[in-house]
Structure formats: C-alpha cells, structure tokens
Design a protein with these regions (language model features):
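Conserved P-loop NTPase architecture
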Residues: 65, 89-96, 116-203
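Conserved amphipathic alpha-helical "coupling/scaffold" segments
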Residues: 1-138, 142
Length: 203
C-alpha cells in the first residue's frame, strides 16, 4: 500500500518509513481526523489549486544534515544557506495555500518569515542564495573595486572571500534560534505530502 502512494517528495517517503507505529488511541484518532480533513479537502478543492500544492511539495528536499549543523552552531556554507532559504519560502507558500482553505491548523507549519528576512535582505522572494551586497557595505565597496581594477583581482578576491565567510558566520548565528522551527517545518511538509497522497488514494 505504501509503495502505491503517489508522494511528491522523496523526503516524505523516508519520513513515513522512519515513523514509529502509533499505539496510543489518541494518536490514532488524531491521525484519522487529519486524514479525514485532507480527504474532504481534495474532494472540494479545484484541480488547479490542488495541482499547485502538489507541485510545490515536489520541492521538499531532505536537509536534515543542514538542520543538524544549524542546531550545532556550525557556520553554514552557501549550499546549506540556500537549502534553509528554499525550505522557508516553500513552507510559507504551502502554509498560505492551506490557509485559503482553512487547512493551516490541521497540520501547522511554523512561521519562517524571519528566516526569509535574514536570507532575503532585498525582499526578492527568490529561492536562490547569494551573499548580497546588502549584507556588508565593505563587501559591496570591495566588489566595486574588483570591477574597476581587474588587475587587482587576486588580492581583492582573497579579501572578499574573508568578508563573505564573515557574512556566512553572522547569518548562521542569526539562523540558529530558528533551527527547531525549520526542522518542524520540514516534518510538517512531509506530513502534508503523505496525507494528500493517502487522501487521493482513497478517492
């Protein structure tokens, strides 16, 4: 039966397989209540909105290693910072879609607006990561000098690299308090993916 579930993300499948078997009556009841709400949702929602939600869930990736590093006060690299930003934007988009149909309290997704603000200083809401000039005035000035004086590239690039690493360290420190919320958001999205797949299988 699990193999027949049309899950949108590989992480949701791993999360489902790793989940402990429920034995407490209240947990089982809660699980069926959630599934019932998702069944009603897929029956009533228009196909375009459902397809949009399913498509977004395809973007859910397994970033548990990154989250572990964030918990452990590690300085995240550019790829890890991208993963956190991507998840935060994805979680916010999915939460908004569910809120439109009063489904946001069925599976609650932690608010990650502050995470987005930290990683998206220019407010572009694009799920890519780059050490923007907005992070550091000194870095902005240095990059301008690099464009104006290409003959000094080697020395200036070394200095820029040191400044960029400082930005990564600062961003990681700012993000650390949100490590648990990011982790919970990843799990919530997997739960939504699983329940949607089960609900569609029941149709």
């Amino acid at each position: 039966m699990l193999d027949q579930l049309e899950l949108q993300s590989g992480f949701a499948r791993r999360w489902l397989l790793d989940s402990s078997l429920m034995t407490a009556d209240e947990d089982i009841t809660r699980c069926y209540d959630v599934l019932h709400r998702f069944f009603d949702f897929v029956e009533k929602v228009d196909k375009t909105r459902l397809d949009t939600l399913l498509f977004k869930l395809q973007g859910l990736k397994d970033i548990r290693t990154t989250i572990k590093n964030l918990h452990n006060h590690a300085t995240l690299d550019d790829i890890e910072l991208f993963e956190v930003k991507h998840l935060a934007i994805l979680a916010t988009d999915v939460a908004r879609l569910l809120h439109e149909h009063e489904m946001d309290r069925v599976v609650e997704i932690p608010a990650l607006d502050e995470v987005i603000s930290i990683l998206d200083p220019d407010g572009m809401k694009i799920a890519t990561f780059y050490i923007y000039d907005s992070y550091c005035a000194q870095l902005k000035e240095l990059r301008a000098r690099m464009r104006q004086h290409p003959e000094q590239q080697d020395d200036l690039m070394l200095e820029a690299g040191e400044l960029e690493e400082g930005v990564r360290k600062d961003l990681s420190l700012q993000l650390h308090p949100f490590a648990t919320a990011v982790e919970q958001a990843q799990i919530a999205l997997a739960c939504i993916d699983v329940n949607l797949a089960k609900a569609m299988q029941m149709r």
